[in-house]
């Protein structure tokens, strides 16, 4: 966070990216030398106290080819389940971001009660990441759009770098997501 009164914790093993983030944000890095495990996070939460934990970790659909199936399931499914479990034990509120990609899009006009019918690995991993006890958890199923810090694979990046005068798209679609500036 750029706001000094907010504590922001993160994990990033890339030293160059860490330095850039530390320079621009009030961030403290969690030393995560081992794999993501319930034991590692239980130890971390035993040493620290939080009112809220917001899960901003996820492997996005545009990058799922860079990661193994095991890594995608660990980050998008298992990690939120671990934090959800810890929220009950450590009495913090947990905010978890999910995606409309838990649906195939075939039906349209989905509601919260609709069957999550994802068929691809990304959608299924995010769907499983929503299977939480929800005692202290709020799941926000939304999309983000904005400039990326390090890659240019997002919709906005594609749109801004296209040389075409006209692009194909939808005329009656509604975007209900958030920008990464919010």
Q: What spans do the regions from the language model cover?
A:
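N-terminal Rossmann NAD(P)H-binding glycine-rich loop of SDR-like oxidoreductase domains
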Residues: 1-6
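N-terminal Rossmann-fold cofactor-binding loop
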Residues: 9-18, 33-35
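SDR active-site strand-loop-helix element
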Residues: 11, 53-57, 94-100, 104, ...
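Conserved catalytic-core motifs of eukaryotic protein kinase domains, centered on the activation segment
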Residues: 21, 63-70, 105-109, 151
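NAD(P)H-binding glycine-rich loop region in Rossmannoid oxidoreductase-like domains
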Residues: 32-75
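Glycine-rich NAD(P)-binding loop of the Rossmann-fold in SDR/ketoreductase-type enzymes
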Residues: 67, 71-82, 116, 120, ...
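Conserved Rossmann-fold NAD(P)-dependent oxidoreductase catalytic core, especially the SDR/UDP-sugar
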Residues: 81-117
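NAD(P)-dependent short-chain dehydrogenase/reductase
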Residues: 131-181
